[in-house]
Amino acid sequence: MAGRVPSLLVLLVFPSSCLAFRSPLSVFKRFKETTRPFSNECLGTTRPVVPIDSSDFALDIRMPGVTPKQSDTYFCMSMRIPVDEEAFVIDFKPRASMDTVHHMLLFGCNMPSSTGSYWFCDEGTCTDKANILYAWARNAPPTRLPKGVGFRVGGETGSKYFVLQVHYGDISAFRDNNKDCSGVSLHLTRLPQPLIAGMYLMMSVDTVIPAGEKVVNSDISCHYKNYPMHVFAYRVHTHHLGKVVSGYRVRNGQWTLIGRQSPQLPQAFYPVGHPVDVSFGDLLAARCVFTGEGRTEATHIGGTSSDEMCNLYIMYYMEAKHAVSFMTCTQNVAPDMFRTIPPEANIPIPVKSDMVMMHEHHKETEYKDKIPLLQQPKREEEEVLDQGDFYSLLSKLLGEREDVVHVHKYNPTEKAESESDLVAEIANVVQKKDLGRSDAREGAEHERGNAILVRDRIHKFHRLVSTLRPPESRVFSLQQPPPGEGTWEPEHTGDFHMEEALDWPGVYLLPGQVSGVALDPKNNLVIFHRGDHVWDGNSFDSKFVYQQIGLGPIEEDTILVIDPNNAAVLQSSGKNLFYLPHGLSIDKDGNYWVTDVALHQVFKLDPNNKEGPVLILGRSMQPGSDQNHFCQPTDVAVDPGTGAIYVSDGYCNSRIVQFSPSGKFITQWGEESSGSSPLPGQFTVPHSLALVPLLGQLCVADRENGRIQCFKTDTKEFVREIKHSSFGRNVFAISYIPGLLFAVNGKPHFGDQEPVQGFVMNFSNGEIIDIFKPVRKHFDMPHDIVASEDGTVYIGDAHTNTVWKFTLTEKLEHRSVKKAGIEVQEIKEAEAVVETKMENKPTSSELQKMQEKQKLIKEPGSGVPVVLITTLLVIPVVVLLAIAIFIRWKKSRAFGDSEHKLETSSGRVLGRFRGKGSGGLNLGNFFASRKGYSRKGFDRLSTEGSDQEKEDDGSESEEEYSAPLPALAPSSS
């Protein structure tokens, strides 16, 4: 009978676990641990719910007697909130010891990932969005909430379940098969609280601590864009290399301390020293100070005890009617601001030896054993990102893609005037430790197969190893790289150079994450941004289904029309329509074409029609790969001649989809890349599109393959690849104007030398003409680019929430075609294409000849110098000119026509080089500033000449006009 007592207690305390459904995977991973009796320390709590009075009750959430088998094990267990009506958590009491537990996290959600008594957290924490309510580590004392403040749970809007995550770092305490029932006790009340508590997490995800480095700083900063919050407690968290963590509110340049603490002290939630309120427009800033002394290899951010973390938890309350339960900051939007951070943030806090409570598994011996695992090649985010998930703070990092995570490394030992130059842009890579594969893909930044299941699952942050590949600090300025590093970068051809327009105030607009930029028919800049929404690791689950629907659509205008001269907002729209904006294009009629990666849809919007979208492609919130669905589509291009719609689809699919002007599916092409050398037509995140109507080509920024691929719009045949080592591993966006192709790359990977920057290329041969960077701020994740035909370029950055304007040092129309890097041959080819199209469809032999002229462009190892090419081109012209003048002089003497002006072929030759010859090199048409469509090939079908070419009727139509492509047969659909 006595032997049955433990079994009866199990049934009484955890009756639901006996009836719960268990997946085969979860049963396999539990090693029969649930069949063992609880240890004596687990028998103290036989009633998980204990009434306190008529309105209050206590809830005991404990692990059900678990025995971890290996270090860095993460176990999760769930408990349903015992009341259906709304309740409020007003107190927490930890039930754990540092002897067995590294740290604990308590989440609130509506559906846990498992219904078993407990499970490995790599199976997921919650299937929906999870909000962190409490975090504990290092024998921290209880957290006390102010009177009238509570975490809202239950009811229609609150969480239905608590999910406890426990990280067991060292398992030496379990060598004798001891069991653990660590957890947390909650005090809840049914009485409504006027103030609702929440958590603001500031977290670095890609800091690298070099071995032997005495001081390494990791900085985090974000703009606060919400209703006022009142900070009442904070908690810092690093592993054993952390010396001090400081958090501040920055308002009008003034730094106000939120909290500063040594992470080697008990990691409790400490009360703030004085009341701190944070209002809309303030900046929140945090700095973690690390040391790499004593290490023989670099230390990265990650989930194991041998890795590091840089987290600042800010506990706050807000008025109930405006309350937001969880907010995050994983960026550094104002790195230069840290030059004025109070000196105290750089001073470690002394800790007495008896106060330092470290696990034995923090010893260097075990650290060295684990390092090789962290040095395996990893893939980049993305947010991903890629990125990182805020939950990694606590446990493990998630990979993030496109527009989400970055950290700047700051060295305070350098002189103040050079501090801003030491800001490092770090590309982080997050990948599951046992995947054993390397794959570049961002934001967030998706991995395919098992990697996708790990990274995009917002709560699948356990048993992941976050390995970072940061670049070394480099100077972000307009200068050439040191000798040997920049052999790929050509000298500026002549005086052709892009420079930031330093007098343009648009750089200070500070919208949300800038995902798209375009130019409308009036040459106004149009910005597509995400407002207060961000794409991070908890945005999507493993099936790419958006997880933050409860936040609702973005409540501010997401489309801004900006005056290109003074950056004034002329018009705004897009409120309550989008969740995660991405691509923006504008067609020849001024319609906006946008994509939303959360909705998995493409929208056509008439800026003058306030009644809603004109056309919608895809199914709302339904990812897919058939003719009626998209999966995180990235960009749209519309052919100005045929009206054909091209969609790059996208992060989950690897294809280009074509639709008719009415939205009927026509065809698709492309497939996922395989291997390290992707073939033509293979993509890894087709991220940006640029149409070249004149040549009938569609170019694609194959982002994670670091290249540009061009295809024929009529046959979908691969034409060529543009790839340079200076691109690095990513090409984020491209934009085309006649003769030129513009592009921006992404953050460098660890060990790479290529910085993030903009490129100008000769479209005819793909050679780089110019490389440029901003002066004010710096590129972090330049997400989109658009160029106008006068050479003005705008670039939007998804991390710094910034838009830059760049202009040419001189007007192109006053520059020789050689100086601009555009060859006469390209113009002649374009003229031939246009003339042929206007007369008849090209024959197959003609198409073959045209294809032969456009060879596959790889970066040349050695090429003919530009000066030599220019000389070879100029010599025949000079000789022809001399012969013509001599003949004319002889004729003048023979016939006495000394007053006759030169009207011969020599004049026509000169006319061609001045852009005045009919059908010649019309630079005025190529580069004159006029109202047109310059976003990604939306070129105006104009028959007007510029002011300097009015006498040359038809010259512009010959160069700009592209006859509509023949309609595809209905069978192709």
Curated annotation (Swiss-Prot):
Keywords: Calcium, Cleavage on pair of basic residues, Copper, Cytoplasmic vesicle, Disulfide bond, Glycoprotein, Lipid metabolism, Lyase, Membrane, Metal-binding, Monooxygenase, Multifunctional enzyme, Oxidoreductase, Phosphoprotein, Repeat, Secreted, Signal, Sulfation, Transmembrane, Transmembrane helix, Vitamin C, Zinc
Bound cofactor: record note: Binds one Zn(2+) ion per subunit.
Activity: how regulated: PAM activity is inhibited by EDTA, phenylglyoxal and diethyl pyrocarbonate. PAL activity is stimulated by cadmium and inhibited by mercury.
Membrane topology value: Single-pass membrane protein
Protein name as it appears in the record: Peptidyl-glycine alpha-amidating monooxygenase
UniProt binding sites for Cu(2+) 1: H102, H103, H167
Function of the protein: Bifunctional enzyme that catalyzes amidation of the C-terminus of proteins. Alpha-amidation is present at the C-terminus of many endocrine hormones and neuropeptides and is required for their activity. C-terminal amidation also takes place in response to protein fragmentation triggered by oxidative stress, promoting degradation of amidated protein fragments by the proteasome. Alpha-amidation involves two sequential reactions, both of which are catalyzed by separate catalytic domains of the enzyme.
Region (Interaction with RASSF9) location: 925-942
Gene: PAM
NHL repeats (start-end): 498-541, 567-608, 617-662, 670-714, 766-809
SUPFAM superfamilies: NHL repeat, PHM/PNGase F
Modification type Phosphoserine: residues: S918, S929, S942, S946, S957
Sequence positions that bind a protein: R530, Y651, R703
Propeptide: 21-30
Binding residues annotated for Zn(2+), in chain numbering: H582, H687, H783
Catalysed reaction equations from the record: a [peptide]-C-terminal glycine + 2 L-ascorbate + O2 = a [peptide]-C-terminal (2S)-2-hydroxyglycine + 2 monodehydro-L-ascorbate radical + H2O; a [peptide]-C-terminal (2S)-2-hydroxyglycine = a [peptide]-C-terminal amide + glyoxylate; N-dodecanoylglycine + 2 L-ascorbate + O2 = N-dodecanoyl-(2S)-hydroxyglycine + 2 monodehydro-L-ascorbate radical + H2O; N-dodecanoyl-(2S)-hydroxyglycine = dodecanamide + glyoxylate
GO terms, molecular function: calcium ion binding; copper ion binding; L-ascorbic acid binding; peptidylamidoglycolate lyase activity; peptidylglycine monooxygenase activity; zinc ion binding
Localization: Cytoplasmic vesicle, Secretory vesicle membrane
Acidic residues bias: start-end ranges: 949-961
Glycosylated residue positions: N762
Segments traversing the membrane: 864-887
Record Pfam families: Cu2_monoox_C, Cu2_monooxygen, NHL
EC number assigned by the record: 1.14.17.3, 4.3.2.5
Residues found modified as Phosphothreonine: T943
Binding site for Ca(2+): V517, L584, D784
Major place of residence: membrane
